[in-house]
């Protein structure tokens, strides 16, 4: 058998080399086209650029979590992350306006890379609980981005305690200094308690600080009104310096509203002399001065012969008669003992003559107190509402002199006619598991538990204590009041707490 010469094998090897060269060239062209397409995609404005170092790490993390169904479904929606980042960024820029200057292209790329690098399993877990306690001008933008995707853009509205740390941590960025930024925000009407830092520790501090302060000023992250209130809310006031209140004319002082920004601290003592002879106890109101001295202000006692509870209030501790010159006002209840009205020493319109009605000496209603009935006997503190006349532009009390039952403070309040009146209510106590009781923070002014202890606030500002009252001994109570109450109003409200209320206990 003859074999082919060696030269016959040469053409076959040449053909193999040419075929492999063609395949290699084809692969090179395909690779070049693919690189061009990827380069074009990277240059598109809506594309989030991923960090090259973080891409393999994200892929490995994704592969390790494919077995978890929650993470897998979470990753399935990550395709729209780039649009969500751009939309949230645009919303935040609209909210902040001119307070944030345009960053250079390199800064935008790094921000986009960081956002895309957080798409992996492990980084996303670390950021899962962020921005829990934030509130401020851009809160709506953050809520919208949270509803659409997991990517967070800004951290706006941190507490004042975290603001300095946030500005220090963000000092190396392309943002303006803290003073320039605060000045710009004040010109634009934006709250100064703002930080653009996104460090994990700062977010945790902001969240914990918000939880600690949740019992002071609650705000809704989805309410535009609460955002405006949070932006315009003043910073917590410093402890007020001790001020000695001078009392020249007792009657004038008892009817004058407390000065704004000053808490008038008083003490009520209960004298039970004569109770063995069927008399009611006498209550004395004294002003607590900073030097330790006590100044008498008012005295009150319940009348014996009266269909309803009727407390007479006088500026003379020895003369508690209605016909005396020291009589300044009274507190009267309804038959159930659940509603009380405070009057001055004017004339009752039902007993007044026509000349008296026109002379302006009709009695003035100074306050009304309504206790919520508790006929089912639920355990817990009393619930009360206090209605007082409003204040005019010069901080004087509006005179309310009703001529019939339809013009009284209680009737206006029940008919939702809130013109020229102020509605207050007691602050809801917090249940303490350790002491198994309801507690309120009286700042050391109340030391004994009692169902009579209360704090009066306004619904729009629960931190401003208009009045507080509580027991410090068996027959000694403290009573502190602020603007817009006067001494007579506060003392009468406290007397209503002493009265027995069978339908409220």
From Swiss-Prot:
What membrane topology does the annotation report for this chain? Peripheral membrane protein
Entry GO MF terms: G protein-coupled receptor binding; intraciliary transport particle A binding; protein-containing complex binding
Tell me where on the tree of life, at the top rank, the source sits. Eukaryota
Localization, per the record, is: Cytoplasm; Nucleus; Secreted; Cell membrane
Gene Ontology cellular-component terms for this entry are: cilium; cytoplasm; cytosol; extracellular region; nucleus; plasma membrane
Looking up Pfam families in the UniProt record yields: Tub, Tub_N
One Gene Ontology BP term is: intraciliary transport
Q: Please tell me whether the keyword RNA-binding is annotated for this protein.
A: no
Which regions are flagged for Acidic residues bias? 196-205
Annotated coiled-coil positions are: none
Q: Which PROSITE patterns match?
A: TUB_1 (PS01200), TUB_2 (PS01201)
Q: Which UniProt keywords apply?
A: Cell membrane, Cytoplasm, Membrane, Nucleus, Obesity, Phagocytosis, Secreted, Sensory transduction
Q: Where is this region: Disordered?
A: 35-243
Q: Which InterPro entries match?
A: Tubby-like_C, Tubby_C, Tubby_C_CS, Tubby_N
Residue stretches of biased makeup (Low complexity): 70-87, 206-220
Protein purpose = Functions in signal transduction from heterotrimeric G protein-coupled receptors. Binds to membranes containing phosphatidylinositol 4,5-bisphosphate. Can bind DNA (in vitro). May contribute to the regulation of transcription in the nucleus. Could be involved in the hypothalamic regulation of body weight. Contribute to stimulation of phagocytosis of apoptotic retinal pigment epithelium (RPE) cells and macrophages.
Record: disease? Defects in Tub are the cause of maturity-onset obesity, insulin resistance and sensory deficits.
The family annotation for this protein states: Belongs to the TUB family.
Provide the assembly information: Interacts with GNAQ. Interacts with TULP1.
Q: What is this protein called?
A: Tubby protein
The organism is Mus musculus
Species lineage, top-down?
A: Eukaryota, Metazoa, Chordata, Craniata, Vertebrata
Name of the coding gene: Tub
């Amino acid at each position: 058998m003859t074999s082919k010469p060696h030269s016959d094998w040469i053409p076959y090897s040449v053909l193999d080399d040419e075929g492999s060269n063609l395949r290699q060239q084809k692969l090179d062209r395909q690779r070049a086209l693919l690189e061009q397409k990827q380069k074009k995609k990277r240059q598109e404005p809506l594309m989030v650029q991923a960090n090259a170092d973080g891409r393999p790490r994200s892929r490995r993390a994704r592969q390790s979590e494919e077995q978890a169904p929650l993470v897998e479904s979470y990753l399935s929606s990550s395709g729209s992350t780039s649009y969500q980042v751009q939309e949230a960024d645009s919303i935040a820029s609209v909210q902040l306006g001119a307070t944030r200057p345009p960053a250079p292209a390199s800064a935008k790329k790094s921000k986009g890379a960081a956002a895309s690098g957080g798409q992996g399993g492990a980084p996303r877990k670390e950021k899962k609980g962020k921005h829990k306690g934030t509130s401020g001008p851009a809160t709506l933008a953050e809520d919208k981005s949270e509803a659409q995707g997991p990517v967070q853009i800004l951290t706006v509205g941190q507490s004042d305690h975290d603001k300095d740390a946030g500005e220090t941590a963000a000092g190396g960025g392309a943002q303006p200094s803290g003073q320039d930024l605060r000045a710009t925000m004040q010109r634009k009407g934006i709250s100064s308690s703002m930080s653009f830092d996104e460090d994990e520790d700062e977010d945790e501090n902001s969240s914990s600080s918000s939880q600690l302060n949740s019992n002071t000023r609650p705000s809704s992250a989805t309410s535009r009104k609460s955002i405006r209130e949070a932006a315009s809310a003043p910073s917590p006031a410093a402890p007020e310096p001790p001020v000695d209140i001078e009392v020249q004319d007792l009657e004038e002082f008892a009817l004058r509203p407390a000065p704004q920004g000053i808490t008038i601290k008083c003490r009520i003592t209960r004298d039970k002399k004569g109770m063995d002879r069927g008399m009611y106890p006498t209550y004395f109101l004294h002003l607590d001065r900073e030097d330790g001295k006590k100044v008498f202000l008012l005295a009150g006692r319940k009348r014996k012969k009266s269909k309803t509870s009727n407390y007479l209030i006088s500026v003379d501790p020895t003369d508690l008669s209605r016909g005396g010159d020291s009589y300044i006002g009274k507190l009267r209840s309804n038959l159930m003992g659940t509603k009380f009205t405070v009057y001055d020493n004017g004339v009752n319109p039902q007993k007044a003559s026509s000349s008296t009605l026109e002379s302006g000496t009709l009695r003035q209603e100074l306050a009304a107190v309504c206790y919520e009935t508790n006929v089912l006997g639920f355990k817990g503190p009393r619930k009360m509402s206090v209605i007082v006349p409003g204040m005019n532009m010069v901080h004087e009390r509006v005179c309310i002199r009703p001529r019939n039952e339809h013009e009284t403070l209680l009737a206006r309040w029940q008919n939702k006619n809130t013109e020229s009146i102020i509605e207050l209510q007691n602050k809801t106590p917090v249940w303490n598991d350790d002491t198994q009781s309801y507690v309120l923070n009286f700042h050391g002014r109340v030391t004994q538990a009692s169902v009579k202890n209360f704090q009066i606030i306004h619904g729009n500002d629960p931190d401003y204590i208009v009045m507080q009252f509580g027991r410090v001994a068996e027959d000694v109570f403290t009573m502190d009041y602020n603007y817009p109450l006067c001494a007579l109003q506060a003392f009468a409200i406290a007397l209503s707490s002493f009265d027995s209320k069978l339908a409220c206990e």
